[in-house]
Amino acid sequence: MSLLSDLINLNLSDTTEKVIAEYIWIGGSGMDLRSKARTLPGPVSDPSELPKWNYDGSSTGQAPGEDSEAIYTHKPFQDPFRRGNNILVICDAYTPAGEPIPTNKRHAAAKVFSHPDVVAEVPWYGIEQEYTLLQKDIQWPLGWPVGGFPGPQGPYYCGVGADKAFGRDIVDAHYKACIYAGINISGINGEVMPGQWEFQVGPSVGISAGDEIWAARYILERITEIAGVVVSFDPKPIPGDWNGAGAHTNYSTKSMREDGGYEVIKAAIDKLGKKHKEHIAAYGEGNERRLTGRHETADINTFLWGVANRGASVRVGRDTEKAGKGYFEDRRPASNMDPYVVTSMIADTTILWKP
């Protein structure tokens, strides 16, 4: 095993300028990540230098199989697994004719974020990505007794100790790997349900928020693969008196961050309320199991906002209210949401939509 480890950790720059690029794209379910690697002649300083590639969409549930789907490169990150000059590359997928395939949500998001009115507002996002670690063979949360349940919620949120925190080595490895990769990860914490954790990405501007969340999810999938643990983004992995898993999305525009921004925030929240059903429909599959009005959520059928209210659909922080400017938190997105969809939809509703 030591020889295998030595070979995995070879520093290619000792003998060659060649680098390995791992191309990452989203599969047919809209949540499954796929990737494959190719050799490049040397380090890449700009995404435009990365060649387009292709893949068999019939094997990812994305095409009938007569032709190969194309993947276009967008955002490179440093590869924390191969290290050196090797990179991970976030891509999106197209038909051979150049049309975005149905699971390519980045293409439409990029159109929203390139709109001059949106560009002028410099939208910031901070996404709180929750997830649950599962024992591989039984698909049951890490640290839970087989076929049984731990003690009730209370001691696990930000908890410390072998009977409260399960999988911290995975969480910390992921945290450091994201920083190494160049992802703007801003923190981690243990969540209310044991075996559940959260990482935060942001503040990130526009389309980069989606790129960074998907890259962070990919790195987490790779680390749990190594650890022999399954990561679940199900919004309610365990029924009953247990917290679900969300992806609270913090948001601000230039106008909100400036003096008088609180009025802009309230106007934006009013718009979100008027499009509540449309947003809920796009905020993650199975979210109705999570948004019940219990466990720090609002009821899925009701739009409610408030200051410092964790049971609201949209929450405004006390600091924002006091300063008269800042940001707000959309608490509705599920943990399995597509960040391209959620971020662009919030921008579209609050900036571009005219009721």
Curated annotation (Swiss-Prot):
PROSITE patterns reported for this sequence: GLNA_1 (PS00180), GLNA_ATP (PS00181), GS_BETA_GRASP (PS51986), GS_CATALYTIC (PS51987)
Reactions the enzyme catalyzes: L-glutamate + NH4(+) + ATP = L-glutamine + ADP + phosphate + H(+)
The keyword Ligase appears for this protein: yes
SMART domains: Gln-synt_C
Primary localization: cytoplasm
A matching Pfam family: Gln-synt_C
The protein's enzyme class: ligase
The protein's Enzyme Commission number: 6.3.1.2
Biological process, per Gene Ontology: glutamine biosynthetic process
Record's protein name: Glutamine synthetase cytosolic isozyme 1
Species of provenance: Glycine max
